[in-house]
């Protein structure tokens, strides 16, 4: 039976028995305590907790789920996968154990035609009711096992109850049951009976007034049974993806265990990524987006392990969508966008994987037993390697990873980020003094409000008053001040009365519905409870509105130019300045940057009306409003429109009334901030005009310097560039001649030991002084001098030259002992010598027996490393 048929069969079975069919919720859970929807009951958790009414007393669903806790086991076992579909029927105070058990048994036997002698049941030891109902269904007593672990709870105070599980015997015949051999018996259905209420200590304190049923049956597992295959990867929704990967790679599934693991990883991770991107997730370096990035990057490595050198995501995602669209038809319309997101990640990480793998390989070849924490951090931070991927690659080579060192460096990086953040944003973790307080925000309509102080707080301490020179947090009944939120910087201004004056330096929201003003008391004495006047700096507010409205304009233009796949990844705006991050698979060209700025200013000059309305989230999204991914919205949302449908976004920030009030936008920077994420920075209003004036002044200075008119400038710069190119070439030619002439002089520095000429030295010590100052020496110069000396020497020699260049030690080694017979010949090869030398400098190198080169990181040890190597070589040549 096809998986799609199983899905429909299950829904139809329970629909005929009075259940309302509930569509699958998004994989992106609304529960902040979990990253993804990990169980069929999760969308109904508020109903089970009696915090929301259920959609119907009886519900049935097939829920998309993602679990990555066992991601390392994916591909290695027949049952582990990250994406799965959970079929479930639910009762909210309607039926209970008897009906749930009867429904389950009837579906398994009558609808799926499973052999009853292959089915086993487990119950909680104290749940005699469930045992009785299973026996009444015809399950033999010996196939009902009691397990104390069959008890479900939320893990905290709340509903709880016993559960009953149905297992399928994969082998058949006599056996010990699930308790005795868990690998032989596959759990297919779990029936949870919520009947108790537990306290925080886990003690049952009462029975629930309404008993509920929550069941879950894995669609992939039951498909595995009904299709008669040995693993979930052989079922009809995963096997086609796996076969496509096999076709691309030329690998045959079932022939090689390591290849089989990679094929399974590809099949699972591609399908999981397909469904996550379809639900709106995008790769990033934190939270849910990082999990998606891990899945995609593990897929890239799996493809490389299979020998796939070309990009393959386009083909694999198309196959996955073709298979999954039967159950999820919305995939067809989203496929182009999904492939664009996935292929971008594939392209960027393929390059990083090659560079990072080479770095990791050099570490592995240096006879070290482990990957250092520093190297792991560099791979993670610079090349984007997820740490689990680093440990996986290291494990394949028999190495471990210095995780303590890695996490120490990660913590230092996070501490630096937090320190930077704390300098720009007030972080209030202690909400003492604010409990129960609310403030009414009037700042959309008013910039000045007469109101009352409801609290004075300093460092978590409630004050009755504050004097001149104090910095204190003030809560008001009503406020016109906008708090830092949604990327918009807080308002500035003053809070004053006849008794004091306080300068508002920032505004924040420590609790939902509460605005707090951090004030420097400029004069007088402020007393809690007094009536004050709160006044926003109107010029600063207007300039902030210019930037925020311009951010929406830039967003709309970005989507016009780069497509709907270019979604907002972050923003920041303050008076005169905006920063906007968006997803894009490539670096925009110079002409596209110019076009972006021109389009934005054209929209500004079009005098587009700006309005805001309150509506439901459902209606806003249906009208085309952009809801930013990762933001949490209530049932009622504020929708800001610019030019009607041209720009519609859910936004609580402050805005202008007409686009023309922005005046002008100047795009001053466009850069990459992460893989697949671009950033534009713009100036707005007066700051933009000021920037234009500075640019004109700079152009005038360049014109005077070049002695050219504005029309002649480009040609003059080209001439200057060509002259510079010729000068560099002449300087390089002079340097080459100088080094060629310098090499014979260097021969005078050689010493003789056992008829072998030796020079092991820091080359920079011979290249100092005014004669050498015009030249900038490179690693290639060290190589060139070494090879020149090698050519000039007509006798046995050991030559190693090193120098510190840009903080790293670069070295080259030449050895010729062909005409002498020494017992140390095997040890004294250039390849061995360069490796021994650079290992002491935390570096690596290699080459041939007669010539080798490389680099090291620890420049401080250069002198001692040269002395030690020289002593070692002399000792070997002397027979010591």
From Swiss-Prot:
Free-text remark on how the cofactor is bound: Binds 1 zinc ion per subunit.
Keywords per UniProt = Aminoacyl-tRNA synthetase, ATP-binding, Cytoplasm, Ligase, Metal-binding, Nucleotide-binding, Protein biosynthesis, RNA-binding, tRNA-binding, Zinc
Q: Which GO terms describe its molecular function?
A: alanine-tRNA ligase activity; aminoacyl-tRNA deacylase activity; ATP binding; tRNA binding; zinc ion binding
One GO cellular component term of this record is:
cytosol
Residue positions annotated to bind Zn(2+) are 548, 552, 651, 655
The role this protein plays is: Catalyzes the attachment of alanine to tRNA(Ala) in a two-step reaction: alanine is first activated by ATP to form Ala-AMP and then transferred to the acceptor end of tRNA(Ala). Also edits incorrectly charged Ser-tRNA(Ala) and Gly-tRNA(Ala) via its editing domain.
Question: Record's domain comment?
Answer: Consists of three domains; the N-terminal catalytic domain, the editing domain and the C-terminal C-Ala domain. The editing domain removes incorrectly charged amino acids, while the C-Ala domain, along with tRNA(Ala), serves as a bridge to cooperatively bring together the editing and aminoacylation centers thus stimulating deacylation of misacylated tRNAs.
- Quote the InterPro entries the UniProt record gives: aa-tRNA-synth_II/BPL/LPL, Ala-tRNA-lgiase_IIc, Ala-tRNA-ligase_IIc_anticod-bd, Ala-tRNA-synth_IIc_core, Ala-tRNA-synth_IIc_N, Ala-tRNA_ligase, Ala_tRNA_ligase_euk/bac, DHHA1_dom
Which Pfam families does the record associate with it? DHHA1, tRNA-synt_2c, tRNA_SAD
The cofactors required by this protein are: Zn(2+)
**What catalytic activity is recorded?**
tRNA(Ala) + L-alanine + ATP = L-alanyl-tRNA(Ala) + AMP + diphosphate
Just give the chief location class. Answer: cytoplasm
Instruction: Spell out the PROSITE patterns in the cross-references.
Output: AA_TRNA_LIGASE_II_ALA (PS50860)
Q: Name one GO biological process term.
A: alanyl-tRNA aminoacylation
The record's EC number reads 6.1.1.7
EC class of this enzyme?
ligase
Localization recorded for this chain is: Cytoplasm
The entry sums up its family as follows: Belongs to the class-II aminoacyl-tRNA synthetase family.
Q: What NCBIfam families does this protein's entry cite?
A: alaS
What name does this protein carry?
Alanine--tRNA ligase
């Amino acid at each position: 039976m096809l998986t799609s048929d199983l899905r429909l069969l299950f829904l139809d079975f329970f629909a005929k028995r009075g259940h309302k069919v509930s569509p699958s919720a998004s994989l992106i859970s609304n529960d902040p305590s979990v990253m993804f929807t990990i169980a069929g009951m999760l969308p109904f958790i508020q109903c089970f907790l009696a915090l929301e009414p259920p959609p119907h007393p009886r519900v049935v669903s097939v829920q998309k789920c993602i679990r990555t806790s066992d991601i390392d086991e994916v591909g290695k076992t027949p049952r582990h996968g990250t994406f799965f579909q959970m079929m479930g029927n639910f009762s909210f105070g309607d039926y209970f154990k008897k009906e749930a058990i009867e429904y389950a048994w009837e579906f398994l036997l009558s609808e799926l035609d499973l052999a009853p002698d292959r089915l086993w049941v487990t119950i909680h030891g104290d749940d005699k009711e469930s045992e009785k109902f299973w026996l009444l269904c015809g399950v033999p007593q010996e196939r009902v096992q009691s397990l104390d672990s069959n008890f479900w709870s939320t893990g905290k105070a709340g509903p709880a109850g016993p559960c009953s599980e149905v297992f399928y015997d994969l082998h058949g015949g006599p056996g010990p049951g699930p308790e005795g051999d868990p690998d032989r018996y596959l759990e297919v259905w779990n029936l949870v009976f919520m009947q108790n209420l537990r306290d925080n200590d886990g003690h049952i304190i009462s029975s629930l007034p309404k008993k509920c049923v929550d069941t879950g049956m894995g669609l992939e597992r039951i498909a595995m049974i009904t299709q008669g295959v040995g693993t979930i990867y052989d079922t009809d929704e995963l096997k086609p993806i796996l076969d496509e990967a096999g076709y691309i790679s030329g690998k045959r599934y079932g022939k090689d265990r390591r290849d089989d693991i990679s094929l399974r990883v590809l099949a699972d991770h591609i399908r999981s990524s397909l469904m996550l991107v379809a639900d709106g997730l995008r790769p990033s370096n934190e939270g849910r987006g990082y999990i998606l990035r891990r899945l995609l990057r593990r897929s890239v490595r799996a493809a490389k392990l299979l020998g796939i050198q070309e990009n393959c995501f386009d083909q694999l995602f198309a196959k996955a969508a073709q298979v999954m669209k039967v159950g999820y038809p919305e995939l067809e319309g989203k496929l182009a966008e999904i492939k664009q997101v996935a292929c971008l990640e594939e392209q960027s990480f393929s390059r990083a994987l090659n560079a990072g793998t080479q770095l990791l390989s050099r570490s592995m070849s240096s006879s070290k037993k482990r990957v250092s924490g520093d190297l792991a951090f560099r791979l993670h931070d610079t090349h984007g390697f997820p740490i689990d991927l680093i440990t996986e690659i290291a494990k394949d080579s028999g190495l471990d990873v210095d995780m303590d060192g890695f996490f120490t460096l990660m913590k230092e990086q996070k501490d630096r980020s937090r320190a930077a953040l704390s300098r720009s944003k007030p972080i209030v973790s202690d909400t003492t003094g604010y409990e129960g307080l609310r403030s009414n925000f009037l700042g959309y309509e008013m910039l000045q409000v007469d109101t009352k102080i409801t609290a004075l707080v300093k460092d978590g301490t409630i004050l009755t008053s504050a004097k001149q020179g104090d910095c204190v947090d003030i809560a008001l009944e009503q406020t016109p001040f906008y708090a830092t939120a949604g990327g918009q910087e807080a308002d500035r201004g003053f809070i004053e009365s006849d008794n004091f004056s306080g300068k508002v330096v920032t505004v924040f929201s420590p609790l939902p519905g509460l605005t707090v003003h951090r004030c420097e008391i400029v004069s007088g004495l402020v007393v809690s409870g007094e009536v004050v006047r709160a006044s926003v700096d109107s010029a600063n507010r207007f300039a902030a509105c210019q930037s925020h409205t311009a951010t929406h304009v830039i967003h709309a233009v970005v989507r016009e130019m780069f497509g709907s796949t270019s979604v907002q990844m972050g923003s920041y705006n303050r008076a005169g300045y905006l920063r906007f991050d968006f997803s894009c698979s490539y670096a925009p060209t110079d002409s596209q940057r110019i076009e972006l700025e021109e389009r934005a200013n054209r929209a500004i000059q079009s005098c587009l009306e700006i309005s805001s309305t309150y509506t439901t989230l459902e209606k806003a999204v249906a009208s085309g409003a952009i809801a930013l991914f990762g933001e949490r919205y209530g049932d009622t949302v504020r929708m800001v429109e610019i030019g009607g449908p041209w720009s519609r976004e859910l936004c609580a920030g402050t805005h202008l009334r007409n686009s023309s009030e922005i005046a002008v936008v100047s795009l001053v920077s466009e850069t990459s901030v992460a893989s697949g994420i671009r950033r534009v920075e713009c100036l707005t209003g007066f700051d933009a005009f000021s920037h234009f004036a500075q640019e004109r002044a700079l152009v005038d200075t360049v014109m005077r310097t070049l002695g050219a008119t504005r029309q002649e400038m480009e040609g003059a710069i080209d001439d200057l560039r060509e002259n510079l190119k010729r000068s560099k070439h002449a300087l390089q030619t002079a340097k080459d001649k100088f080094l060629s002439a310098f090499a014979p002089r260097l021969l005078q520095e050689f010493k003789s030991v056992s008829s072998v000429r030796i020079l092991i030295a820091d080359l920079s010590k011979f290249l100092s002084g005014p004669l050498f100052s015009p030249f900038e020496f490179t690693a290639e110069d060290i190589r060139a001098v070494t090879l020149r000396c090698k050519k000039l020497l007509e006798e046995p020699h050991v030559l190693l030259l090193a120098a510190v260049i840009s903080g790293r030690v670069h070295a080259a080694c030449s050895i010729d002992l062909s005409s002498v017979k020494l017992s140390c010949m095997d040890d004294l090869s250039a390849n061995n010598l360069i490796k021994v030398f650079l290992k002491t400098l935390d570096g690596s190198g290699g080459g041939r027996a007669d010539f080798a080169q490389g680099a090291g990181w620890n420049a401080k040890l250069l002198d001692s490393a040269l002395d030690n190597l020289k002593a070692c070589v002399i000792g070997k040549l002397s027979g010591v």
